[in-house]
Structures are given as C-alpha cells and as structure tokens.
C-alpha cells in the first residue's frame, strides 16, 4: 500500500498537517486503486497529527459551524489534476469524498503523477469522460467558490476549500 506506507509517514506531510493548523481531518479514501488498507492510513495519520481523524461520512456533523470548518482538513481521493487551471477532480461515492472536499476550509489532495493532465480536454480524452458519464456527480475543485448572486456582492468561499494543497507523487520504478 504505497500511500499509507510511504507518503503518509513522511516528515513533509507531517509539516503540511502541522502548518494547516487543523483540529480534525476528514478522511474519505475508499479502499481501491491507491489504498488497499484504510486502517493503516488512518493509523499513520493519527501518528502525524494530534488532530482527530474522522471518516468523511461524519463531515456534516464535524463541520456544523464556520469555526469547525476552518479547523478541518479534508482528505478526499483526487482521481486527477488539471495543470492549466490548478484543478483537482474528486468523484462522488459512498465514502463521502464530496463532503470532504466541499465542507472543510483546507483540502489536501495526494495524487499519482500519472494522474496529472495538462488540460480538462486531455483528461476527458483519456478516460475522464467515462467517469463524468458514470457518476452522479464529480467535483472539479479549483479553490474557493465565488458568487455574486446576492445583491451583486462578491462572496468568496461559500463552498469548497479556501486552501488547496496538492502533493504529487512519482510512480515507483518498475
């Protein structure tokens, strides 16, 4: 299990978590492509941070106030990143990935370098289109939302993270 065994215990990730100043981490990684042992990832995170590590299914109770959302780091599984816009792609699912990407103020995405695409069109042409057609929702997270639909006053950060941290990992040599 590459992510739990090598990325999570790293001193760099410990510094990122400490710098984020979060009191809780919402973990939304399902077992699958990059994670065969969710319990190992949770244990490794608990060893790096004094923050509470919660399953993202508890996001709505963990982020009921603005103060709670500010103190929360979301760690959903990003399936791709788009270099031209700084966007990460998060798929929906029972693991709570969308809540973990929309409710906390800080979002940490850990990606395989092979999942980094120059543009949205490149990603869509190499399999992203099928994900968009198969899932009920897919979040394209570029940063805090911006809206001016109430009295034409710009409001930033109503939905989505205010801080987006992306860690890109090189594939292991064959």
Placement of each model-derived feature along the sequence:
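The feature marks the mature, well-folded catalytic cores of soluble enzymes
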Residues: 1-174
């Amino acid at each position: 299990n590459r992510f739990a065994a090598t990325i999570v215990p790293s001193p760099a990730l410990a510094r990122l978590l400490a710098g984020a100043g979060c009191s809780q981490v919402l973990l939304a990684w399902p077992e699958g492509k990059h994670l065969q042992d969710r319990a190992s990832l949770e244990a490794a995170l608990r060893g790096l941070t004094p923050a509470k590590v919660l399953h993202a299914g508890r996001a709505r109770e963990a982020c009921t106030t603005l103060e709670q959302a500010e103190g929360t780091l979301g760690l959903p599984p990003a399936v791709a990143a788009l270099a031209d816009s700084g966007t990460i792609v998060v798929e929906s699912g029972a693991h709570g990935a969308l809540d973990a990407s929309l409710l906390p103020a800080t979002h940490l995405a850990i990606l395989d370098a092979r999942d980094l695409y120059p543009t949205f069109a490149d990603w869509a042409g190499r399999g992203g289109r099928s994900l968009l057609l198969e899932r009920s929702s897919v979040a394209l997270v570029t940063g805090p939302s911006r809206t001016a639909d109430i009295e034409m006053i710009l409001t930033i950060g109503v939905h989505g993270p205010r801080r987006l941290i992306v860690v890109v990992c090189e594939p292991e040599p064959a």
